[in-house]
């Protein structure tokens, strides 16, 4: 009798390597699936390791461009910062990983999907809600959450089954990375009073070590999409990765955040997102130049809600679909180039230009070339202030008394 097939989201680390053997012992035929979303994984090594540990098949997928174009771009155009700080690094990759897991499951005829998330984090929610949205018929298994082992028990299990134990197990931090940034938690970071050590950072340098000379970059957008950096056309993934290096060496994008998790607990997170911060800053500036006032004032409401739905694992929900539709409808005229100075942790916009600019220098100037009709202001003020004036006239006739 053929074994039930299960597709495992495989990272190559201890948790998911142990999960392969545990699932095999539980009677499954395990198919491993690993994505590269810009963290620089050695896919060949991971593919081979999955087979060595016990998987019958191992898929490795280079998903950098898809992640950039279909997920990171939405976060960029939404200026997405959960709670005003977190640019949704891990939250963005989970729906793409879930999508690929479902695709592999369909291709292999699998009846279940497994992930390596714990029962305390947000990722278990993101994976399972996404999988159920895409494939309601598939069963979801969570070995790490189910077995409730300690780290020591996992290591002992790995040694008993000749599973290679990663050499970095003494690393005190829990790290997740993709091209949109790097997240870090655990270890000394669990004390919110502790200053993050430099060992917690990888994409950025400290302000003390940042160069004393800034870098000036020019980012060109077409319909809200970054298409070139300093005049060189690039794919979106390559542009983000290149900007991570340039902005990172100036210490741009360090974020230290106390975060309200979906599961109800607070966590202390340290993020590095040099490209994300720089691109969002530039994109927002271009919108300011090209948006009419009403759209500029309303869009932040949509941005906040998109940030929440993505963080909460609702990427494939009807609400997110509707919010993204509005978002995309605003980007048609977001065309132009933004000049940004990167210096000592800051991304500072110093210039902007657009063929769709709504800024009219002749209207804005106070020089003799002014074309603004100041006489029109009298009638505008009268009508604009009319409700306030009427209210004041009516209420000034009313005597308010207070009896004790």
UniProtKB/Swiss-Prot annotation:
The lineage of its organism: Bacteria, Bacillati, Bacillota, Bacilli, Bacillales. L-citrulline binds at residues 86, 122, 126, 174, 183, 259, 271. Pathway: Amino-acid biosynthesis; L-arginine biosynthesis; L-arginine from L-ornithine and carbamoyl phosphate: step 2/3. The keyword Amino-acid biosynthesis applies. Its EC number is 6.3.4.5. Pfam families: Arginosuc_syn_C, Arginosuc_synth. GO terms for biological process: argininosuccinate metabolic process; L-arginine biosynthetic process; urea cycle. This is Argininosuccinate synthase. It comes from Listeria monocytogenes serotype 4a (strain HCC23). The keyword Transcription regulation does not apply. ATP binds at residues 9-17, 116. The gene is argG. It is an enzyme of class 6 (ligase). Keywords: Amino-acid biosynthesis, Arginine biosynthesis, ATP-binding, Cytoplasm, Ligase, Nucleotide-binding. GO terms for cellular component: cytoplasm. Belongs to the argininosuccinate synthase family. Type 1 subfamily. HAMAP family: Arg_succ_synth_type1. L-aspartate binds at residues 118, 122-123. InterPro entries: Arginosuc_syn_C, Arginosuc_syn_N, Arginosuc_synth, Arginosuc_synth_CS, Arginosuc_synth_type_1_subfam, AS_cat/multimer_dom_body, Rossmann-like_a/b/a_fold. It catalyses: L-citrulline + L-aspartate + ATP = 2-(N(omega)-L-arginino)succinate + AMP + diphosphate + H(+). It is found in: Cytoplasm. Homotetramer. One of its GO terms (molecular function) is ATP binding.
């Amino acid at each position: 009798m053929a074994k039930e097939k299960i597709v495992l989201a495989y990272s190559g680390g201890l948790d998911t390597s142990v999960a392969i053997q545990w699932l095999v012992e539980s009677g499954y035929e395990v198919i491993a699936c690993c994505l590269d979303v810009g963290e620089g994984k050695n896919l060949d090594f991971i593919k081979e390791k999955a087979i060595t540990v016990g998987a019958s098949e191992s898929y490795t997928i280079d998903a950098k461009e898809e992640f950039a174009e279909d997920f990171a771009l939405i976060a960029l155009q939404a200026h997405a910062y959960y709670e005003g700080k977190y640019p949704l690094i891990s939250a963005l990759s989970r729906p793409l990983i879930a999508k690929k897991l479902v695709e592999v499951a369909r291709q292999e005829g699998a009846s279940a999907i497994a992930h390596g998330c714990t029962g305390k984090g947000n990722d278990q929610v993101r994976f399972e809600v996404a999988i159920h949205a895409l494939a309601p018929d598939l069963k979801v298994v969570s070995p790490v959450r189910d077995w409730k082992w300690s780290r020591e028990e996992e290591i002992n299990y790995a040694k008993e089954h000749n599973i290679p134990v990663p050499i970095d197990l003494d690393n005190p931090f829990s790290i997740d990375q993709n091209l949109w940034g790097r997240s870090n938690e655990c270890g000394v970071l669990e004390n919110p009073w502790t200053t993050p050590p430099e060992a917690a950072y990888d994409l950025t340098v400290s302000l003390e070590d940042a160069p004393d000379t800034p870098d000036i970059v020019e980012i060109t957008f077409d319909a809200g999409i970054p298409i070139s950096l300093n005049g060189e056309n690039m794919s979106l993934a390559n542009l983000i990765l290149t900007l991570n290096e340039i902005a990172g060496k100036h210490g741009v994008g360090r974020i230290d955040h106390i975060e309200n998790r979906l599961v109800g607990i607070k966590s202390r997170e340290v993020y590095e997102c040099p490209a994300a911060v720089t691109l969002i800053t530039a994109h927002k500036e271009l919108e300011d130049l090209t948006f009419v006032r009403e759209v500029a004032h309303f869009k932040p409401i949509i941005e906040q809600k998109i940030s929440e739905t993505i963080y909460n694992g609702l990427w494939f929900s009807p609400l997110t679909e509707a919010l993204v539709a509005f978002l995309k409808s605003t980007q048609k005229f977001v065309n132009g180039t933004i000049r940004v100075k990167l210096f000592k942790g800051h991304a500072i916009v110093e210039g902007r230009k657009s063929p769709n600019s709504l800024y009219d220098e002749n209207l804005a100037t106070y020089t003799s070339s002014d074309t603004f009709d100041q006489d029109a202001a009298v009638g505008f003020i009268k009508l604009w202030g009319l409700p306030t004036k009427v209210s004041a006239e009516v209420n000034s006739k009313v005597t308010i008394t207070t009896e004790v």
